[in-house]
Amino acid sequence: MRRVVITGLGIVSCLGNDKDTVSANLRAGRPGIRFNPSYAEMGLRSHVSGSVDLNLEELIDRKVFRFMGDAAAYAYLAMEQAIKDSGLTPEQISNPRTGLIAGSGGASTLNQMEAIDTLREKGVKRIGPYRVTRTMGSTVSACLATPFQIKGVNYSISSACATSAHCIGQAMEQIQLGKQDVVFAGGGEEEHWSQSCLFDAMGALSTQYNETPEKASRAYDAKRDGFVIAGGGGMVVVEELEHALKRGAKIYAEIVGYGATSDGYDMVAPSGEGAIRCMQQALATVDAPIDYLNTHGTSTPVGDVAEIRGVREVFGDKAPAISSTKSLSGHSLGAAGVHEAIYCLLMMEGGFIAGSANIDELDPEVADLPILRETRENAKLDTVMSNSFGFGGTNATLVLKRWQG
């Protein structure tokens, strides 16, 4: 079986818009969650979010940007970073052996809303020709593959909050099967009240910490009350090992495990059993102990406990250090999987583990496991696991191992 490594990364998030800033904020335990005035103005019960601070029109050429909503734009900027980080040449990028798998959870509800408003107020001819590419399910892969001249595989996966983790896993499998040598993998997510209101309406978002936004996302705290929605994008360069070595690439880690399962249980409530099978599937190809687990840990009362019960079942009394970076970053939905894979890579590189922030009182249901509440320095991370689960009972687990050379 061909071995697969990660040789580049790029990130746009509420924790920063480059890897160094993100790493520093993770290490310092600085959350990126703020008060969102538009949520309050529109009457949402949740007034907090993890918003990206960028002027997209200034950063992306107009001829490229006109086809994009925010999700695609965030992923585009992340891909620019990942390409630079990887050292790939234009000839290696635009090559039949180089592909792209990237998606989002919700494309662009803002553009859908604006198109409908235009239809009602001015008629169909005034909608314009660019709304389709901004709102279609494959907007992220389409809006990246064209400007970057991708010639290999080119498609999106949309699997709710597991989206970009599945994209990374699928990229690994494309390379293992010999169909590609390099695959850009990841995703993006727009953060706008037009999508956030849907989660607010179902009672999924945090509402009790509007006056203290930085404390609203609090996985494993006894008084957590829902997740904090976020936006952003991330891309990683997934590459066949020998191809990477031949060109002298920097190797962040080897992807040694990938699990993908379905609960087959409930549309929104996790079974826990599906997550167990997912982690077990990912671990089946791993020959080393897990040093750190970045949980899905969204700060919901039900979801956090269900996942931890699964962790207990999989690891027994040998559970690794555990934290949820969503306590700092919020939940970027379709971008969460790649964001958290990147967080793991940055922690592995920097020798630290970001703690689960805002745990004032640890939930008794999870108190028997080694959940870190503060940053752990001088952490030797050789093998790490990251979980991403989504509505509809979809699950993804990635295991990354330090490349020893």
From Swiss-Prot:
It is found in: Cytoplasm. The keyword Methyltransferase does not apply. The active site is at C161, H296, H331. It is an enzyme of class 2 (transferase). It holds the Pfam family Ketoacyl-synt_C. Keywords: Acyltransferase, Cytoplasm, Fatty acid biosynthesis, Fatty acid metabolism, Lipid biosynthesis, Lipid metabolism, Transferase. GO terms for molecular function: 3-oxoacyl-[acyl-carrier-protein] synthase activity. One of its GO terms (biological process) is fatty acid biosynthetic process. InterPro entries: Beta-ketoacyl_synthase, Ketoacyl_synth_AS, Ketoacyl_synth_C, Ketoacyl_synth_N, PKS_Beta-ketoAc_synthase_dom, Thiolase-like. Involved in the type II fatty acid elongation cycle. Catalyzes the elongation of a wide range of acyl-ACP by the addition of two carbons from malonyl-ACP to an acyl acceptor. Can also use unsaturated fatty acids. Catalyzes a key reaction in unsaturated fatty acid (UFA) synthesis, the elongation of the cis-3-decenoyl-ACP produced by FabA. Homodimer. Belongs to the thiolase-like superfamily. Beta-ketoacyl-ACP synthases family. This is 3-oxoacyl-[acyl-carrier-protein] synthase 1. The gene is fabB.
